[in-house]
């Protein structure tokens, strides 16, 4: 064995060990930022906050009275974001408002059960089970309806807002 091959072997081992230490550190850092850190932002308190926001938004969306439509629609819009806000603005003015005024439709919704399906630091999906009572001038006796809704939530400016509202 020559002197040259012995010096290369002595030099190579510390370099490989140093690279393994750096790679292990990079892997640990990556796992912290992608796995552990998001988990700390989605604890039980975050789950309760997103359920409360989804429930309040759903009740605001599904509860209105012909006497207070503008106030009711404004309250509902404060819980919405993105394309769903645009859709709801058009739908509420073009479909709901004329029908509510013409027929005197009044609806009241309440959330009876809820569960978080997905929770990430900036988005969530909540399942809501809703009871809705509807009255109108044509039907003064309340009509009760039960429904379930998949509510997609997005965090915007520190607040959870509804980005999708899909009946199941």
Give, region by region, the residue ranges found by the protein language model.
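Amphipathic, hydrophobic N-terminal targeting peptides for secretion and organelle import
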Residues: 1-42
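Short, low-complexity Ser/Thr-rich regulatory SLiMs
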Residues: 20, 118, 153-155
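Short acidic/polar alpha-helix capping motifs at helix-coil junctions
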Residues: 21-25, 34-41, 61-62, 77-80, ...
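Short, flexible segments with low predicted structural confidence
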Residues: 21-29, 47-49, 97-98, 124
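Core segments of small alpha/beta cavity-forming domains
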Residues: 45-101
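Surface-exposed, charged secondary-structure patches
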Residues: 101-135
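Periplasmic/lumenal scaffold domains of single-pass inner-membrane subunits
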Residues: 136-141
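Short beta-strand edge/turn micro-motifs at domain boundaries
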Residues: 146-168
């Amino acid at each position: 064995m020559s002197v040259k091959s012995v010096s290369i072997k002595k030099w190579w081992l510390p370099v490989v060990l140093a690279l393994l230490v750096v790679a292990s550190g990079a892997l640990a850092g990556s796992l912290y930022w992608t796995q552990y850190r998001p988990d700390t932002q989605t604890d039980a308190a975050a789950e309760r906050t997103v359920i409360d926001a989804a429930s309040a938004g759903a009740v605001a969306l599904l509860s209105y009275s012909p006497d207070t439509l503008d106030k009711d629609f404004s309250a509902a819009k404060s819980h919405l974001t993105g394309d769903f806000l645009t859709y709801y603005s058009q739908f509420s003015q073009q479909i709901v408002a004329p029908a509510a005024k013409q027929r005197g439709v009044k609806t009241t919704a309440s959330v009876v059960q809820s569960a978080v399906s997905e929770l990430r630091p900036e988005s969530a999906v909540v399942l809501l089970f809703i009871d809705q009572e509807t009255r109108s001038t044509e039907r003064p006796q309340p009509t009760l309806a039960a429904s379930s809704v998949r509510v997609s939530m997005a965090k915007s400016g520190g607040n959870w807002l509804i980005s999708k509202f899909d009946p199941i």
